[in-house]
Amino acid sequence: MLFRSQQGAFQLRYFGAEVFVVDLVGILQLREIGVLLTAIMIAGRSGSAITAEIGSMKMREEIDALKVIGLNPVGVLVFPRLVALVIAVPCLTVIANAAALGGGLLVSWFYSGIAPETFIDRLHAGIDLSTIFAGLIKAPFMAIVIGIVASVEGMKVGGSAESLGRQVTASVVRSIFVVIVLDGLFAMFYVAIDF
């Protein structure tokens, strides 16, 4: 967000519209970038951990043991992780948005001379609740996608460490790809419903 603020201010300076960098930063961060970058980081960090954990349990035949004692592995291993992701990703998105807007405020202040009060006033004027919710609505869906992809890849692990490494890599790549596609689909959906 720091670089977007700096580059946005640099380009808008040519038109005498530097103050509109606040609108650019606010809308872009809250609507698109905040949730997308958060989901990508979660896919890399937590998605890989979920795949590795479930995959190593599969390698040691612990999942088969769960089935033998009458427990459903999806209910015991997958569902709690999905719930945790659905709670964590929106919370982390809010934190990421706050940090990015704070960084945008600092860059706008030091680089463009936009006072913090002006930044906050412009942010209040240019951002409404629909902008905030446009990003936050995506977060649980992205969390579910990350959790499902990570769990499925973990369940595919064979009996070797090589298989585990391959599935962890596949989990991260597929999760990031699906999250980006999902973000694009949400953007098209929002345009279609004028949200």
Feature locations, PLM:
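Short, small-residue-biased leader/transition segments that mark boundaries at the very start
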Residues: M1-L2
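Membrane-interfacial helix-loop-helix connectors in multipass membrane proteins
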Residues: S5-L30, A98-P140, I144, I148-A170, ...
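Short cytoplasmic-facing helical segments at TM-TM junctions of multi-pass membrane proteins
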Residues: E53-F79, A161-L164
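Hydrophobic alpha-helical transmembrane segments of multi-pass membrane proteins
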Residues: A9, L37-T38, A43, I50, ...
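Final/C-terminal transmembrane alpha-helix of multipass membrane proteins
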Residues: L164, V172-M188
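Start (N-cap) of specific transmembrane helices in multi-pass transporter permeases
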Residues: P73-T93, S171
